[in-house]
UniProtKB/Swiss-Prot annotation:
Subcellular location: Cytoplasm; Nucleus, Nucleolus
Residue ranges, compositional bias (Polar residues): 7-16
Record carries keyword RNA-binding: yes
Function: Required for small ribosomal subunit (SSU) synthesis. Has a role in the processing of early nucleolar and late cytoplasmic pre-RNA species.
Organism: Yarrowia lipolytica (strain CLIB 122 / E 150)
Gene Ontology biological-process annotations: ribosome biogenesis
GO molecular function: RNA binding
Keywords from the named record: Cytoplasm, Nucleus, Ribosome biogenesis, RNA-binding
Pfam families, per the entry: KH_KRR1_1st (PF17903), KH_PNO1_2nd (PF22891)
Oligomeric and partner information: Component of the small ribosomal subunit, ribosomal RNA processing complex (SSU RRP complex).
Membership in a protein family: Belongs to the PNO1 family.
Name the UniProt record assigns to this protein: Pre-rRNA-processing protein PNO1
Length: 258
């Protein structure tokens, strides 16, 4: 009887492999398991994703996404500098009209302006407040238009409208004239008291400047073409009455179109 009893005691005292074994864990180990565990729901990640979605996209009343304006997105305005030479005969008008010239450059285009009397040039450059990449080019075109002889109010249209530019050509590009013949051609373009020039400007919706043998036209592409054709006809010798008639026809067509 002693042997079976001893055998049973040894079987009862032997530990079974199926029972769970308690393994001591330190506080650092528990923290590591929490940080790397991916089994449970990650509420913190979901909250961050919701915040990012709300910041990037909003919905309107119809449920359509509304994104932020992309005007200032991407790269900023590149630094640039332009120098516009001022002719000697335009220095006095520039000084007289200075209070009208610099406000659109500084307030609207956000440029920095400096007048260099020694070199007789106007310097423009971008700064941290400049928001438009085309501001420097617009400011340069505005100052150049004034130096060519246009009024400040007419040249300021270049800043407001994008499709305006200045075209320049000489009378000798149309027909070789010298001496009195050249003077008569200029007089035919201007007309008595400037009536012919004003008629061309009103019919074509442009501005024309007669600077000796050079002619500067400010306006849109189509409008400049109409004014140029009328001026070329006068240079070639067409009667002013015929040119007026053609301008009336063109003006009526433009009114019907617009």
């Amino acid at each position: 009887m002693g042997a079976p009893t001893a055998k049973r005691q040894t079987q009862a005292t032997e530990p079974t492999t199926d029972a769970p074994v308690a393994i001591p864990q330190t506080e650092g180990a528990e923290e590591d398991e929490v940080m790397i565990s991916m089994d449970g729901p990650r509420e913190d990640i979901a909250v961050l994703q919701e915040k990012d979605d709300d910041a990037e996209m909003t919905l309107d009343q119809d449920g359509k996404p509304r994104f932020a304006s992309a005007v200032n997105a991407g790269e900023g305005v590149k630094p640039g500098r332009m120098k516009v030479p001022i002719p000697p005969h335009r220095m006095a008008p520039l000084k007289n009209e200075w209070m009208k010239i610099y406000p659109p450059l500084v307030e609207q285009l956000k440029l920095q302006v400096r007048m260099n009397p020694r070199k007789k040039q106007l310097e423009l450059r971008t700064c941290s407040n400049t928001v438009d990449n085309s501001a420097l080019q617009k400011g340069t075109d505005f100052v150049r238009a004034f130096t060519l002889g246009f009024d400040v109010d007419d040249a300021m249209a270049i800043i407001r409208l994008d499709e305006l530019y200045v075209e320049t050509f000489e009378i000798k590009d149309v027909k070789t004239l010298q001496g009195d013949h050249l003077g008569r051609a200029i007089g035919r373009i201007a007309g008595k008291d400037g009536k012919t020039k004003f008629a061309i400007e009103n019919a074509s919706r442009t501005r024309v400047v007669l600077a000796d043998s050079k002619i500067h036209i400010l306006g849109g592409f189509t409008n400049i073409k109409i004014a140029r054709e009328a001026i070329v006809s006068l240079i070639l010798g067409s009667p002013p009455g015929k040119v007026y008639g053609n301008l009336r026809i063109v003006a009526s067509r433009m009114k019907e179109r617009f």
